[in-house]
């Protein structure tokens, strides 16, 4: 009887340790880590911090499709901004829903996603682009933030993290962790 109890305690300990490892996998290594060496790459991001209820700073980033994306281009639309990483299993599992949201976006909202090459465990820009080409997401804009400044300005500490920006460009909320499609649509609908 004691062997069974010891075995269950041992199994529970292993399960707790494995759970902690899994949870920490989607956490960043350091909240303030920014790679200053990549600052010469294309992309302009304000160093100002985005604050809830205030107009967020504009940014200009290049997407994996080669297009230039500016937040200011979407004034008058609600913006769903998703920060994610290629190594984050939760992020990868939610990409099909995010792609569907991007396909369904109309005049009311836009979907943008952001990956930061060489930041917080993400692969290099070249490696990410090559990896991403193998995926089949046609409508999903993926913007590259090689300096990590956009991550810092939105206070991203874990992946995925979502930011909801209203039609006037104000940050309504940031939401770390998984959000399903229904919850995202409800959050967008609740905004002005």
Regions from the language model: what does each represent?
Residues 1-58, 192:
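N-terminal targeting signals for export/organelle localization
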Residues 128-165:
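Short, internal strand/loop/helix patches
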Residues 83-100:
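Conserved redox-active cysteine motifs that mediate thiol-disulfide chemistry
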Residues 80-81, 111, 162:
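Hydrophobic beta-strand anchors of alpha/beta hydrolase catalytic cores
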Residues 109-123, 139-147:
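Thiol-based oxidoreductase modules, predominantly thioredoxin-like and allied folds used
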Residues 164-192:
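Thiol-/selenol-based redox modules, centered on thioredoxin-like
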């Amino acid at each position: 009887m004691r062997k069974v109890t010891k075995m269950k305690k041992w199994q529970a300990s292993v399960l707790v340790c494995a759970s902690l490892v899994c949870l920490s996998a989607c956490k960043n290594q350091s909240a303030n880590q920014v790679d200053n060496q990549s600052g010469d790459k294309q992309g302009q991001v304000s160093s100002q911090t985005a604050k809830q209820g205030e107009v967020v700073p504009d940014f200009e980033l290049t997407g994996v499709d080669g297009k230039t994306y500016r937040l200011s281009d979407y004034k008058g639309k609600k913006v769903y901004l998703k920060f994610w990483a290629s190594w984050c299993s939760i992020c990868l599992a939610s990409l099909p829903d995010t792609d569907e949201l991007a396909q369904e976006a109309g005049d009311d909202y836009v979907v943008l996603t952001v990956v930061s090459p060489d930041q917080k465990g993400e692969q290099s820009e070249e490696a990410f682009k090559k990896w991403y080409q193998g995926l089949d997401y046609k409508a999903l804009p993926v913007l590259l933030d090689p300096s990590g400044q956009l991550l810092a300005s939105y206070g991203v500490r874990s992946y995925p993290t979502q930011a909801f920006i209203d039609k006037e460009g104000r940050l309504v909320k940031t939401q770390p962790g998984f959000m399903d499609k229904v919850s995202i649509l409800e959050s967008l609908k609740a905004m002005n």
